[in-house]
Amino acid sequence: MAYAQIANQHGLRSPENSLNSNKTCLYHLGVQKDVKRATISYANNTRKPEVFEKLFYSLSSALDRNGRKKFRKDFYGIDATELSLNLHDFPWATFRSTKSGVKIHLTYDINNSLPKYLFITNANEHENNTLKKMNIAKGCTVTFDKGYCNYAVFGDFCRDKIFFVTRLKENAQYRVIEEHESRNKHITLDRTIEFTGMQTGRKCPFPLRVIKSVDEKTGKEITILTNIFNLSAGYIAGMYRARWNIEIFFKTIKQNLRIKKFFGRTENAVKTQIRIALTVYLLYMKLRQLCIYGGKNFTNFMSELKVCLFERKDLFEWFAGSPPPVVYHPNDFQQELWA
């Protein structure tokens, strides 16, 4: 299945044919029999996705996260992306009368550009019901859109010393406790507030901070809600805008990995394929860290790797972008022929 991801195969017949056309290479990999699509299909539908879940987390934990950080330590973005499915082929994932779909919920390490934690649900699962399931540890900082607004969870975050940066809902009721001055020209408001709504005040009875920031490129103003008081308003606004990195990640994997078309129709097959796809991305990141420098982005990496999967070459030299040595043959008859 990882081969099908990298080689951008369509259906199970395609990887079956292409793998069997390289039998000598498969022999050196320990595969002594022909690859059968029935075998792949059976494994895809019956092998528990928890196996690939453990592989994903094992590889994720092995990646180096000690590089240079743009933001504070343990800073994560939380978001979800929906994958549309055919209602007729995937009836188990129905969430509208005419549509099926699944949703990938992801915790993303913004400083290191790495997925950290994920789970997959039916597409009708709303974000504000999943925030408490995102496996956020004490002392971490998370940023997410206002679709995740859940005042009870915000209260739990304050109790557990988990820091968050999100957007304030327009209808939120609160009273101002203190106004703060800011020398940043892009910060129009900075204040400490307390919720006064009957439900919000009970669920989150802690002082919070509201910041209004104007984007210097678009001129759009956003209202940010956070429980961080020891950082500047401009820095916190930058933390919220860094949430866009997770959107770029989703766009990248959708363009370069097969997670919009599936090889199997069962829930097990869909979840397995998604986890294997993200494991392929982690393998890319591991290779990038092992090289002296990462000379290829993920798009270039995938487009070049799929045409040389069965070639014997030094991956580290190739990945770092070292050009092949020029070999001169004085008796090159081909050159003489075309001279």
Model-found features: residue ranges?
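Short Lys/Arg-enriched helix C-cap and helix-to-coil transition segments
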Residues: 51-62
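A short, well-structured juxtamembrane/interface segment
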Residues: 60-67, 127-128
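Single, function-defining residue in the core of a domain
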Residues: 1-14, 44-47, 54-55, 70-74, ...
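Hydrophobic alpha-helical packing residues
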Residues: 19-22, 59, 253
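DNA-recognition alpha helix
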Residues: 11-29
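A glycine- and small-aliphatic-rich helix-loop capping segment at beta-alpha/alpha-beta transitions
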Residues: 93
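Major-groove recognition helix of helix-turn-helix-like DNA-binding domains
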Residues: 28-47
